[in-house]
C-alpha cells in the first residue's frame, strides 16, 4: 500500500494497492504507448488504481477504485461502506454513492437511490435515508444530498457506471 509519491504506508493506512516491479507475471508495458505505461508506475511500483488497507498479517482489504473515491472536507471516502449502509434502509432497493462538485467541501457525498416498489420518493424520505447513514457511520460519510432514480446505469457485468451518474447530476 503506497501513497501518491510511491512511499510505502504503515499498516492500517489507506492508500493505493501496488505491486513491486519487476515480477515475472506482471504486465510489462502498453504496446507502443510509453506515456500510458509511465502513468502505471510510481517508482518501482505498478499501481493498480485500487485503494486498500494492509493489516498486520499482510492481508489487503479492498476499499474501492481510486477513481470512485470521493474527497470531501479533507476525507477520502470509498463509496462501498456508505452504499452497504444505504442498502440496509427498508425503502432502498439499490444505491450508488458519488461525489459531486462542492465549493466548500471539494466534493459533496451524494446518494442516488432506487426506491423499493411502492415507495414514493419525497424530501422526508431523503432526510430519513440521510439520517439512517448518519446514525450508523462517521459524520463525514453521510450523504449531504439524496437523489432518486428509477434505475442505476450499469455495465454489461452489473457494475455501477459512476461516471454516468456524476454527469447526470452535474448538468
Q: Predicted regions span which residues?
A:
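Adenylate-forming AMP-binding core of the ANL superfamily, especially NRPS adenylation
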Residues: 1-32, 40
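General small-molecule cofactor/ligand-binding pocket signal
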Residues: 146-149
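AMP-binding/adenylate-forming catalytic core of the ANL superfamily
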Residues: 21-23, 28-29, 36, 51-141, ...
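Hydrophobic alpha-helical segments, especially N-terminal targeting/anchoring helices
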Residues: 2-3, 11, 48, 54, ...
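FAD-site-proximal beta/loop scaffold in flavoenzymes
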Residues: 44
Amino acid at each position: 500500500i503506497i501513497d501518491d509519491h510511491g512511499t510505502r504506508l504503515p499498516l492500517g493506512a489507506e492508500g493505493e494497492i501496488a505491486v513491486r516491479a519487476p515480477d515475472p507475471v506482471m504486465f510489462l508495458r502498453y504496446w507502443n504507448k510509453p506515456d500510458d505505461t509511465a502513468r502505471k508506475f510510481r517508482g518501482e511500483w505498478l499501481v493498480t488504481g485500487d485503494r486498500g488497507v494492509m493489516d498486520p498479517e499482510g492481508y489487503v482489504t479492498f476499499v474501492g477504485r481510486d477513481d470512485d473515491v470521493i474527497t470531501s472536507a479533507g476525507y477520502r471516502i470509498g463509496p462501498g461502506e456508505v452504499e452497504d449502509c444505504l442498502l440496509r434502509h427498508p425503502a432502498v432497493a439499490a444505491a450508488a454513492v458519488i461525489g459531486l462538485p462542492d465549493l466548500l467541501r471539494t466534493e459533496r457525498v451524494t446518494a442516488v437511490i432506487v426506491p423499493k416498489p411502492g415507495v414514493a420518493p419525497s424530501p422526508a424520505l431523503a432526510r430519513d435515508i440521510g439520517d439512517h447513514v448518519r446514525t450508523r457511520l462517521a459524520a463525514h460519510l453521510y450523504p449531504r444530498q439524496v437523489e432518486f432514480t428509477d434505475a442505476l446505469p450499469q455495465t454489461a457485468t452489473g457494475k455501477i457506471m459512476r461516471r454516468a451518474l456524476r454527469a447526470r447530476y452535474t448538468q
